[in-house]
Amino acid sequence: MILILHPLENLKSYISSRPPLVIFMVSVSGMAIAFLTLGYFFKMKEIKSPEMTEDWNTFLLRFNNLDLCVSENETLKHFLNETTPPESTVTSGQARSSTQTPQALEDSGPINISVAITLTLDPLKPFGGYSRNITHLSSTIFGHQIGLSGRDSHEEMNITFTLPAAWNSDDCIVHGHCEQVVFTTCMTVTAASSVFPVTVQPPHCIPETYSNASLWYKIFTTARDSGTKYAQDYNPFWCYKGAVGKVYHALNPKLTVIVPEDDRSLINLHLMDTSYFLFVMVITMFCYAVIRGRPSKLRQSNSEFSPEKVALSDA
């Protein structure tokens, strides 16, 4: 007995007689392609770890929401350019020692961490600048002002910006008004250790040797979060006769915690195996459709009502 196959006819019959199975095959094919693409994506792309919600990139980006006001009414504080002995400061390296437990970190008190960050000072029109050389800007904020939640939202944080060069009114006199200036500053944050992320830290700067000015003057600024602009008690003259400072942190890919390569390879393997299984299922169903075509009951019923049999019965 010779088996004669009509693949195209069988496939057409299968599609017309079994639409639900055809839709199922298309859906499974789409899932297989999606898993295959996703597996390739996990293999080739570095993925941010979902387990680590806060790293130093996200932490420093929080300061972008701050507005600092450098007012003419603030009192300047003069201090000497003296290097602080290493023994008198709790460094970030000590605070992040792997031998310390979380409880020990909480009991160690406030720590200082200094990182380089961009500070923009945008003087308003009435602002006339300072005759003294301003080398430091200092402010005190609370955790909720930079979007921290829970217990950290009530933590007090002292921020000090060390300017690489003195900021004074010399340029204001030359131009007739004070223009916007941009500094790459050394920002020192003093706060409880629980406020800081426990991930890889950015490169540190040394405030004591950052500025090249011989005389140091510090000015205290007030800070507010950007959400205050939309509050009902917003004061449009909040920084009248002052300069508005904005902090800007550029993303550093080295600070982002990524999924380890071994984990990504394992994810890729599972996704590939799943996609291969789905492809085999689709190919099997396709071969069945090519060989069998429409159901046998449907073929039998059609043969019973074929034109030849109808003609013979009429005769």
Swiss-Prot record:
Keyword match Oxidoreductase: no
On whether Membrane is a keyword of this UniProt record, the answer is yes
Record-annotated membrane-spanning stretches = 22-42, 180-200, 271-291
How is this protein positioned relative to the membrane? Multi-pass membrane protein
Q: Which UniProt keywords apply?
A: Membrane, Transmembrane, Transmembrane helix
Q: Where is the composition biased (Polar residues)?
A: 82-103
Predominant location category: membrane
Q: Which Pfam families match?
A: TMEM219
Span list, region Disordered: 82-106
Instruction: Name a single GO cellular component.
Output: membrane
Q: Where in the cell is it found?
A: Membrane
Q: Which PANTHER family match?
A: TRANSMEMBRANE PROTEIN 248, TRANSMEMBRANE PROTEIN 248-LIKE
Q: Which family does it belong to?
A: Belongs to the TMEM248 family.
What is the protein's given name?
Answer: Transmembrane protein 248
Q: What is the protein's species of origin?
A: Xenopus tropicalis
